Amino acid sequence: MTEDIRVRYAPSPTGHLHIGNARTAIFNWLFARHYNGKFIIRIEDTDSARNIADGEKSQLENLAWLGLDWDESPEKPGEYGPYRQSERNEQGIYQPFIDKLLTEGLAYKSYKTSEQLASEREAQQAAKQAPHYVYEYEGLTREEREAKYAEFEAKGLKPVVRFRVPEEKTYAWDDIVKGHIEIGAKEVGGDWVIQKADGMPTYNFAVVVDDHMMKISHVLRGDDHVSNTPKQMMIFEALGWDIPQFGHMALIINGETGKKLSKRDENVLQFVEQYKALGYQPQAMVNFIGLLGWSPKGEDEIFSLEEFKQMFDETRLSKANAKFDQKKLEWINNQWMRRDLEEIMPQLIQELVTANLVSPADATAKADWLAQVIKVAGVEGISYTREIVDLVRQPFFELGDITDEMVAYLTSEEGRRVFDAWESAYIALPDDATAEDYLNAIRGIQNQLEIKGRNLWNPIRIATTHEVQGPNLPEMLVVLDKATVLQTMADVKSNYLN
């Protein structure tokens, strides 16, 4: 592309950063960065009743956590600010364009009450008509319409401003993702509100003014905005402005139900900060989200944000719905944890502090030992960092109960022989014995007693760790405190073998 690319991510601060919104932001960022364009963040806060106090903060902090940067935003203003719609409204940016449409007869003031609107909808339903707004000034001249305005104003009524929909027109565009789309003006539900009674512009009006004034070249957003596009095209055309290119990404569906991902789906965590709190890695989240509705060439599935940027191709955005597969996210996150183990080690150790397995002081003083424990336990079996707690809890920080199955191994004739041989071998090994030393000692017992497999390994593991399975035993023995292991073995002998 040779044109100047300017794209925007424009969230409403009515909630925290949702997976779907994160995908919109990521793909806009990729589009901008791949083509050396600009990525703008604009806050669409016109619905003040639904805005939450930390909604904007959550959006920006979590976007930054994902590794995204931006060229313009409320906190990084450029020449096209302000970047909050509420502030733009306070500065009177929208009103001249409302007035222009009113003056040209392309919009009008409507004083209908909610009761009148409800009555009209009921009548339409009774007549089996599609819901639509009924124009109340049919046949009136501009002067007669102005007189009606004055009459309503005298009664203390506050109007909304509605755009006069050209009913016979069809709005068509070549969607970046979905291809050619046509929607008839009649499908938008009649004349629609562009300014509320409190003077605040509605979303579909404000977004057009903002996109034009901020020189947005491409609008890449979710499939649920397709129905908004003809309304926005109406305003672009009415004001004589160029229309940006639109692209509507496929829905994200619940991988289990096959239905659109809903905030009511309690089986799926849907907000980025929830995954962040569990210890998912930002690279993994970007990797997973970047594959929701977009496919690279080849079979590889592990990509960094930089790799995504280099190979991004908007023509590979899928028309088919994207399946949210929790298991795949867990697999991708595990791949990134294994790849970046040294980098995330402080985070893993902090999980142990949070779970009260170690004190903050020991987390620092024993950092090397804790890192050894984590490496021996292995992150291969966990999906996110918080799971490291249960992985290392036993036997590194506490011992589990000895079960009847374990007792059977210990008290069998072979088990007693293995225990006695292992006790002697372990005591004889030096404190700095290596994993190879421990393995050779166990092999020596195998050769001496001619016992192998579970009948050899289980009595040793039970006597040492109170477990029948777990990480590599010789490697565990290297990091376990020898005095502690000797006490564990003494207790086992006293309780079960005397």
From Swiss-Prot:
**Residues binding ATP:** 263
Stated EC number for the protein is 6.1.1.17
| Motif annotated as 'HIGH' region, chain positions | 11-21
Q: Which InterPro entries match?
A: aa-tRNA-synth_I_cd-bd, aa-tRNA-synth_I_codon-bd_sub2, aa-tRNA-synth_I_CS, aa_tRNA-synth_I_cd-bd_sf, Glu-tRNA-ligase_bac/mito, Glu/Gln-tRNA-synth, Glu/Gln-tRNA-synth_Ib_cat-dom, GluQ/Sye
Catalysed reaction(s) here are: tRNA(Glu) + L-glutamate + ATP = L-glutamyl-tRNA(Glu) + AMP + diphosphate
Report any Pfam family annotated for this entry: Anticodon_2
Keywords recorded for this protein, A-Z: Aminoacyl-tRNA synthetase, ATP-binding, Cytoplasm, Ligase, Nucleotide-binding, Protein biosynthesis
A GO BP annotation: glutamyl-tRNA aminoacylation
Endpoints of the signal sequence: none
Q: Which family does it belong to?
A: Belongs to the class-I aminoacyl-tRNA synthetase family. Glutamate--tRNA ligase type 1 subfamily.
Q: Which HAMAP family match?
A: Glu_tRNA_synth_type1
How is the subunit organization of this protein annotated in UniProt? Answer: Monomer.
Role according to the record:
Catalyzes the attachment of glutamate to tRNA(Glu) in a two-step reaction: glutamate is first activated by ATP to form Glu-AMP and then transferred to the acceptor end of tRNA(Glu).
Name the record gives this protein: Glutamate--tRNA ligase
